[in-house]
């Protein structure tokens, strides 16, 4: 329905979130129930920070992984007992290290990412708390002070994935690639309930790739 008019089509291809696309259909035209989705294991969501610094950041490359705390404990907080991790692993990207157009001369653009379980509570207070956690460790591990050099900061988390992308539970990567959610065991590309309706994206075949 566009501008209060129906649009006819020979084929419909949905690139939106698979679960969301099905909720736009009458229940009898959906392939998968809410229980089906609830029982699936999803790959992580993420808390991202987009940060501008008024100086060049030292001792980092374009891509940097900060795995200085227990990997298994963080993984358990994503997959086993979903909760905010006490001490999060995080990834940092500084695109201005390799692309001078990413930041003004003498300044730096940074992106910080914390993997999280999908469906977690997401508040500004939690975002602020976790930025403080990782930026303090970042300063310690890279042997420099940067907090007072922040001139821009925005965050993106579970609620934003839901609001902007209709992402199921705010996931960032689709279903986890477990044995029973791989290849032909994933949601089907072609609807069995609606003629010539097809799906694409991270929740169907082939999925988002190996890491999640």
Regions found by a protein language model. Give the residues of each.
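Glycine-rich phosphate/pyrophosphate-binding beta-alpha loops
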Residues: 46-48, 186, 202-212
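A glycine-rich dinucleotide-binding beta-alpha-beta segment and adjacent secondary-structure elements
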Residues: 91, 144-205
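Hydrophobic, well-ordered secondary-structure elements that form the walls
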Residues: 13, 51, 112, 138, ...
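Mid-domain catalytic core of redox enzymes
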Residues: 2-103
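Short glycine/proline-enriched loop/turn "hinge" motifs that connect secondary-structure elements
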Residues: 100-107, 188-192
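Flavin-binding catalytic cores
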Residues: 56, 85, 124-163
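Conserved FAD/dinucleotide-binding core of flavoprotein oxidoreductases
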Residues: 19-25, 54, 104-137
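Glycine- and acidic
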Residues: 46, 115-124, 198-204
């Amino acid at each position: 329905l566009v501008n209060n008019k129906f649009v006819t089509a020979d084929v419909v291809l949905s690139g939106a979130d698979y679960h969301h696309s099905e909720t736009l259909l009458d229940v009898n035209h959906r392939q998968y129930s809410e229980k089906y989705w609830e029982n699936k294991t999803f790959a992580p969501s993420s808390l991202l920070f987009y940060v501008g610094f008024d100086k060049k950041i030292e001792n980092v490359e374009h891509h940097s992984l900060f795995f200085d705390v227990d990997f298994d404990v963080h993984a358990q907080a994503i997959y086993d007992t979903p909760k905010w991790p006490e001490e999060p692993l995080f990834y940092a990207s500084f695109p201005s290290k390799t692309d001078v157009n990413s930041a003004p001369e003498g300044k730096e653009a940074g992106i910080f990412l914390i993997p999280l379980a999908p469906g977690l509570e997401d508040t500004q207070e939690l975002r602020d708390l976790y930025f403080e956690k990782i930026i303090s460790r970042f300063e310690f591990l890279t042997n420099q002070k940067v907090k007072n050099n922040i001139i821009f900061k925005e965050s993106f988390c579970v609620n934003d994935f839901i609001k902007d992308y209709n992402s199921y539970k705010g996931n960032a990567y689709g279903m986890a690639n477990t044995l029973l959610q791989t290849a032909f065991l994933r949601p089907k590309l072609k609807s069995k309930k609606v003629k010539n309706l097809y799906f694409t994206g991270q929740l169907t075949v082939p999925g988002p790739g190996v890491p999640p």
